[in-house]
């Protein structure tokens, strides 16, 4: 169990594998929609994670994702295509998670940000509306934009030649006379960005296992307190009296204001009173011990006291 760092400060068992922080369901939907999130116990058992979709083996951040009630994350297009291949008379229990075989449809009595977001997403397709008990709708298929590929340009030499000829024409064009004032060109509109061709020459094997991202949310200028722990020595065995050494170190390092005359007098009076009470207790104990061993105080040794039948 851990405490989420959001303003709600809720106790949660969920742990973000990428940012390495405890998250509640509200932060999970709002800020960690494409992160691998599971229980903290699973993080302790195995901290490795796969940032790719388990259905298409492509990075989860590349397309729109959806999170099931078991907190497994997939591409929405992959889940939709997989469920659309099932027969129309499939029961709601037949739609299962590809990873853990859990139910895709959230239970009716389950309330929470993750379940609500999943219901809103499932309500956009007919196969899920039938499982949720909603009337069917006319689906509008919106094709996803295909990324540009370097293979679209078959002859790069012609492309370079065209670019060179355009630059030569611009250089050969005479500049306008100085007495003609040219209006400044307006900046390009942000709504219509220029299209560029992006060529990725790296291999796709590096995307299968991405390194863990570490985001340290602690301030550098803030010194670690008594309970401060970093990730390196978080699970290291500590000595039995380590807390006492840290406490003494923190007490010795902090500056104290000098005591005033009244405070000194009160402290001396308190110490004197404690010493007087200790002296009284000691003298009382010693006096009782002396009285117990005194024969004059023993009733059996007194000749005027007769014990027994008369």
UniProtKB/Swiss-Prot annotation:
Residues 162-196 are annotated as: Disordered. The B box-type and RING-type zinc fingers although degenerate play a central role in function of the protein. It comes from Mus musculus. One of its GO terms (molecular function) is zinc ion binding. Belongs to the ZFPL1 family. Required for cis-Golgi integrity and efficient ER to Golgi transport. Involved in the maintenance of the integrity of the cis-Golgi, possibly via its interaction with GOLGA2/GM130. It comes from the Eukaryota. Interacts with GOLGA2/GM130. GO terms for biological process: vesicle-mediated transport. Phosphorylated. This is Zinc finger protein-like 1. It is a single-pass membrane protein. One of its GO terms (cellular component) is membrane.
């Amino acid at each position: 169990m851990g405490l989420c760092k959001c303003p709600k400060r809720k106790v949660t068992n969920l742990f973000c594998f990428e940012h390495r922080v405890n998250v509640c369901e509200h932060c999970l939907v709002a800020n960690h929609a494409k992160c691998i999130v599971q229980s903290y116990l699973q993080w302790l058992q195995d901290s490795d994670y796969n940032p790719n979709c388990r259905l298409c083996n492509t990075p989860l951040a590349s397309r729109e994702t959806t999170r099931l009630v078991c907190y497994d994350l997939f591409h929405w297009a992959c889940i939709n295509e997989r469920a659309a291949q099932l027969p129309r008379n499939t029961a709601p229990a037949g739609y299962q998670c590809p990873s853990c075989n859990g139910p895709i449809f959230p239970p009716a009595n389950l309330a929470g940000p993750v379940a609500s977001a999943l219901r809103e997403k499932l309500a956009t397709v007919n196969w899920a509306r039938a499982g949720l008990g909603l009337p069917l709708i006319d689906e509008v298929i919106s094709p996803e934009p295909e990324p540009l590929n370097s293979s679209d340009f078959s002859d790069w030499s012609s492309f370079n030649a065209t670019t060179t000829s355009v630059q030569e024409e611009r250089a050969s064009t005479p500049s306008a006379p100085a007495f003609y004032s040219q209006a400044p060109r307006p900046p390009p509109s942000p709504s219509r960005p220029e299209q560029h061709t992006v060529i990725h020459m790296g291999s796709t094997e590096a995307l299968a296992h991405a390194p863990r991202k570490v985001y340290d949310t602690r301030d550098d200028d803030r010194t670690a307190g008594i309970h401060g722990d970093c990730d390196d020595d978080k699970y290291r065995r500590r000595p039995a009296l380590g807390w006492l050494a840290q406490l003494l170190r923190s007490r010795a390092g902090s500056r104290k204001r000098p005591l005033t005359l009244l405070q000194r007098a009160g402290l001396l009076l308190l110490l004197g009173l404690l010493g007087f009470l200790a002296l009284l207790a000691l003298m009382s104990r010693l006096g009782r011990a002396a009285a117990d061993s005194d024969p004059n105080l023993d009733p059996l040794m007194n000749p005027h006291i007769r014990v027994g039948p008369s």
